[in-house]
Amino acid sequence: PETGLGATTPSTSHFPLQTSHYLNWIRQGTLYLGMGVFFWLISGQTAISFVPGPSIHTGLYATFLEVKKRVPGNSALLTWWDYGYAITDATGLATFHDGGGQTSPKTYFIARGLISSDQDELYDITQYLATEGNRGIAENNTSPEALLAAVRNPKLKPWDPIYLFFTADMTGKYGAISKLGSWDIVKGGSKPRGYQNMVCNKITNEEMNCSGAKIDLKAGKINNRVALKRMVFIRDGQVLREQAFGHAQGYTLQLLVAGQQIVEVQLIDEEVFRSNYNQMFLLGRYREDLYEETYNAFPFSRLFRVKYQ
């Protein structure tokens, strides 16, 4: 604007605009900084900082790929359903059941075969499911007795090679497998059993302190009350040493050894000890007239060919 002296003075109208921009920048910066601090503070309490690991152990998954190399492409694998899709995806091989078919009657019989102490029964169940499947189960389900008789006396032989594929996750899932497989189809009800992993802070030749219990290895007693029937040392899926305590009944301690170190201690009852899963997968004990071991990748997995041909 002009003054009375004919001179002009500089305009100050742009100063408020500059100040407004500056204040706006300060507000935005403060907002973003505050949000950043907020998310940093809560990240430890939420899933933001959580990076999930693989759902299948990489060591176990590597054995899927090895199985693919060792069996004919037209083979079928009897295993637990949880990894059915993953196994088929990795190997191209068929499985007896998977996440889409775990509610079928096959699942009951597979579970029954795994927890059975009779390797003949697992052999018969596998043969029946491979040749008759759910259709045969439905046709013979006129009574519980008739169905069990049909499954235990299969008439046909499988055309394609059949394999049993045990995987380490089945140890942790044994309780669920046992709950299904022990179902009494005549009277109803089941008696689930499982593996109890013991956390030990002392192991000597004479005693063990595990999960708050004192285990006397001379007398074969837990807390001087519960009897132990045997103790088994396992390395690479084979029995390294077995010690009997002289009790007619009792629990079994299974100690898994890697190198010279005890890496896992399991407490199980007699039915779990005698189960096909425990005997074949963990102890490496199997009927050579019925099964042939094809691949031992213990502690991750183990593969057996069922001798039908």
Language-model-derived ranges and their functions:
Residues 4-11, 23-309:
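Extracytoplasmic
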